[in-house]
Amino acid sequence: MMTTPIIDFIEKYKKSGAVRLHMPGHKGVGALGFESADITEIDGADSLYEAHGIIRESEENASALFGCPTFYSTEGSSLAIRAMLYLAVLAAREEDPARPPLVFAARNCHKTFVSAAALLDIDVRWLYPEAGGNYLSCTVTPQALDAALAAAERKPAAVYITSPDYLGNIADVAGLAAVCHRRGTLLLVDNAHGAYLRFLPVSRHPVDLGADACCDSAHKTLPVLTGGAYLHISRNAPAVFCAGARRALALFGSTSPSYLILQSLDAANRELAGGFPARLGDMAERTASLGKSLAAHGFTLTGDEPMKLTIAARPWGYTGEGLARALYDAGIVPEFYDPDYLVMMVSPSNSAADISRLGEALMSIPRRRAEDIILPLPGRPRAAMRIRDAVMSPAERIPVEKAVGRVLADTSVGCPPAVPIAVSGEIIDENAVRCFEYYGIGSCIVTKEIDG
């Protein structure tokens, strides 16, 4: 029977009737109903970044479930991304302390990667897809990565990819990991959308496929409150990764982690050790069946992630927003849409009726004549400054139509999807402006021009 030490401690505390002369200020009462379970680091409650008691026991339960050392984050995968990049920097500085570390990164990274590169003074070499592609996707093959590493003037501290990506494409993690290890570097994976991959009948989790470290947003696909996430470390990673994981998380994390989220992660262990894998397998089959039915109906689907349905909207005669509005009218709320795609995320917490209702709603949308639209494809902007220098420069916000030739200071993209079209330090060209305008970005933050 899987234990839940964090929940058990807090339930006992709630029943004790103790006078709360500690934070938080609500003292366990309030309008929302969950305040009694919201505590701080009192005696016995442990401390997330110095865990030795109930939190450590819960993390050990998670480690057993994932088959590798696992550490909790109450600040999403963003915290775990910064932490694993910091650990890669530590490992690289042991070899070459004199130079800023270099990371090869697939271009469709989350903007947290860019901010981490600025904070950690990382040089980035971007990996692009071999043929065009949407800014949300960047399929890097093992062959292309091997060629890039072979041609590199210096060995990178790590290779960083996003898999699954926002559109549901899963990379060849095993192939990429093999290339990285043969070339003497590490593979880090932003697996924010794929925590559930470990619990499929055959695991597709990055650490099981050879990644040295990855982050999972537990809250995205598991029964966990928003903000709950994991940092996973492979047993084959450099020793500094496990030894320094808590230090890395503490460097970027809040000193007030949410005990509500920690309880949610604790409860998830019991779910994952119980009926979750069977329910996941059943829902994956239902999702695949719906995908086949939609394709037979004429919809164009993309991606191979088992718990995500991504429809290319243009061939049906709509924008992604147009399809999303039809779903909203049917009482269905999708994860994401843009001018080209509609993304829907499914989990075992959905019901069979939910899937049937989604299928009926989509198939009731009449097909229209597809318009001939030339999509602006992301280019390869030229960098004028290092990421850190651009982020730390005086900056101003200007309309995108006036931005050609200026240097981007901030990545200028919301969440979702939080994937930048241009990156800090790059010169904004006409193609970037077309992309900004196409995706509804009306202004951007650029470095200030200094007179004289």
Regions found by a protein language model. Give the residues of each.
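Surface-exposed interaction regions enriched in Ser/Thr/Asp/Glu
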Residues: 103, 362, 437-452
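Conserved C-terminal alpha-helix-loop-beta "cap" of PLP-dependent enzymes
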Residues: 292-441
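Generic structural signal for residues in well-ordered beta-strands
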Residues: 70-71, 124, 334
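N-terminal "arm"/small-domain region of PLP-dependent enzymes with the aminotransferase-like
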Residues: 1-53, 185
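Conserved PLP-enzyme active-site core in the AAT-like
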Residues: 2-11, 50, 75-300
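Short active-site oxyanion
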Residues: 69-70, 99-103, 421
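Conserved N-terminal alpha-helix of the aminotransferase class I/II PLP-enzyme fold
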Residues: 35-79
